[in-house]
Amino acid sequence: MSKTEIKTKQTNASVEDFINTFANTEQKRKDSFELLKIMQDFTGFEPKMWGPSIIGFGQYHYKSEKSLQEGDWPLIGFSPRKAAISLYVYSGCSGQEDLLKELGKFKMGKSCVYVNKLSDINQETLKKIMKSTIDFLQTIIARKKTEQIKMIKFVCYGKKEEYNQ
């Protein structure tokens, strides 16, 4: 199986222009600008376009052993799709299923939450879900960096005891 390249990458496109042209109702535009503020304030990251239709905040590098896909992806994000707003905030980590029970009215995708309008969900619960996802991803990132450092020591020194430290 060959390595496949991810198609959704960070771009320099204008987030505001995207929302103004892509959000198909006034309510969706209003909710999108509100989500933009919530996620930017919460994460401290500037919003960036990912591919033609995802607004992302922060990023992490991933490598899938299953699909052999590797690339960068936003820590959290959203997209004002035609049918609903897709929230890319769910990682399935411990405790998130309980938080979903408190979220409000939504539909669940494989790894995202679909909401018709922002007023349908509890924004404080949304922030808790965002926090748990970011914490989960940053823990994985830190663990992988530690493993890489240990592997570098093993390769450089050629001693098993160095690798196990």
Q: Which residues are covered by each model-predicted region?
A:
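Intrinsic-disorder-associated, low-complexity terminal segments enriched in Asp/Asn/His/Tyr and depleted
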Residues: 163-164
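Charge-dense, helix-prone N-terminal extensions
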Residues: 1-158
